[in-house]
Amino acid sequence: MIPAKTLGAVRVGSVDRIRPAAEALRDIVADLTGLRCAVTDNIAVQEPMKDGAGEILASAVFGFATGDDARWWRFPQLALTSPLPMACRFESEPFWCNAQGIHTPTPNLLLSALDLSNFRERALTSAAIVAPVHLPFGQIAAASFLSPDPEVDDLSAPFEQHGEALALLARTFVASYVKVTERRRPSVATALLSKREVECLRWAAAGKTNDEIGTILGLQRTTVRFHIRSASVKLDAVNRDQTLFKAAQLGFLAMIR
């Protein structure tokens, strides 16, 4: 159990608190496990996390300033090839991984299908404990905890002892950071779609045309178009594709298997 005071130290309450919270996360993790932190608030974007003064946390706080150490945040396209962020797309629990496999508390068949070849070169580490953080709007963040010795390839012991604590610390820091740096319009919180609008969007997301959706739901094509257009206005979207994207971000569209 992590004391409330410890969690409070890594929680970002304002932009001015970003730097102290990041430093607290770094120090708490080092004291607890001896590991380093590498944190990103969104594996899909190129912009690194920054403090209130615009300093990049990866270099200024977490110590990834030069050489290979800095590659993971200086070249964000690595997120497209590294097995670490890829695993975070399919897993929500903390895990540890090395070239031999991705080790989770609960078996995950999707992870077993990931390519781990050339692990050291692609992941920029021999082993890592990873805490995925799944946030609103489909945003995926991740915190990786790494040995100071790049040759260490077994983190099973610290994962067994502290994996859940590391995940809680990471979630508290990242989720609060995202809240204080939020740039979306508040109006997005008022978007309420009707049952029929969601049905039409769900089938549209499955690739169905308005005619096909009308046949499935027993509606006229013009009625289907009306419902999709209505959803578009509510979601402040400019076209059908953006409407589907925003509806998916907000969790209105269930997966069609």
What are the roles of these predicted feature ranges?
Residues 102-108, 133-147, 158:
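Conserved binding/catalytic microenvironments
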Residues 233-257:
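Basic, Lys/Arg-enriched C-terminal extension of HTH/homeodomain DNA-binding domains
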